Each structure stands twice: as C-alpha cells, then as structure tokens.
Amino acid sequence: MINRKFSRRAIAKQLGSIAGGAAVFGPGFAGILARTPAQTEGPFYPPPPHAETDVDLTLLDGHSERAAGDTILVRGRVTDLEGHPLANARVDIWQANHWGRYAHPGDNNPAPLDPNFQGIGIALTDADGRYGFRTIRPAPYPLSAMGDSGMRPRHIHFKVAHETAGEVTTQMYFEGDPLIADDVVMRGTPAELRHLLITSAVEDAATGLPLHRFDIALG
C-alpha cells in the first residue's frame, strides 16, 4: 500500500513551503563537483511499516504537540558531478530525537522516546533537484548502548538515490560540534572532504528558523 504521505502531490505541496523558492538555491552550474562522501548507514534506519514519512518530522497526524527540541530546516539540491540538477531523486533522512534516541527497537539507549517525533522523512526532488525537510536538531548520544565507548556527534542520516546517477548513504553534521573531531565515523572520511558533510545555519527569512543547506552530488 502506498503511504499517502509519500505521494508526489503531497511532497510537492510540502516542498513548496519547507524548501522555499528557487531563488534560495540558485540555478545549476557547470563544473566538476566532489562526489558526496559515503558514510555508514548505521543500525537504526527505522524499520517498516512507517506510519508517516512526510517532510515535516516535527508534527504527526492527529497530534497537537510538536516534537521536543529545536526545530530546524534542512534544504539542499541533488546534482550530478557537473552540477546538473537531478529530478525525482529519492531522499531519505532519519535521526535520533532531542534526547539522542532513535525510533528503532534495536536502540538500547535509555534516553526517552518522543511520541511526537516522526524519526524518518522521505522526499522526492523537484525539477531543480531541490528537497527540504522540517525536523529537530538531534542530540549526540553515547556509543555504550552499542557496546562501544565515546559519543557520536549530532548528525542526520541521508540515503539519496537516483535511477541514472546512482546513490549515496552519508551523514550530515553541525558546524561547531566538538565531538566531530574524534568521531569514529568521520575519521573514516578523508580530511579534505569532511567539510562537505558539515553544515552551518543561517536564519530562514520566511520562518525565522535555523536553515541548514546540505547539497548532494551523485556520480
């Protein structure tokens, strides 16, 4: 059964309000881009069936209360390595909640679950390769629940796929997070490419929310 939240009509409507206008992103450009570095998917992609996968992870159907935490916007463009936009690319995101716990039965973190947080979102890019999500800034979390030591920095998982340009699984990080430098996952990415996975925030003119730009280059 097709999730009604993942229809092209619903995605197009929500992308218009969450991703903003084309002027935010600008036109495509010609040139050779660095391929977005791949990182591990990790063990916590939310298992199906997914009750909701729309682009607003902060508000569930039938709920009057939004997810706990600081609401942010995440927007970007999916392109090939020459900067040409890729329409109809599928963008999956998933992440820990405000307390650092995933909506996954295998997450043994004792932090609380958030009954108002969706945990996963899926979008299709528009004709200009744009996507957009409304979510919350995830918390860092200890690796002890997975039998390891240390902490993971704040991050959002991405899986992006296009029928001709291929796919990448990666993670988006937040500028200024002191945990990035010693992160076991980030250490697996070449130092000269790590900046491609770290985003800074600007204020979104329409909503006043922190806006993180995260572009993906496939090829």
Predicted regions and their residues:
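Beta-strand-dominated extracellular/periplasmic modules and repeats
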Residues: 29-219
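N-terminal secretory signal peptides and thylakoid transit peptides that target proteins
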Residues: 1-22
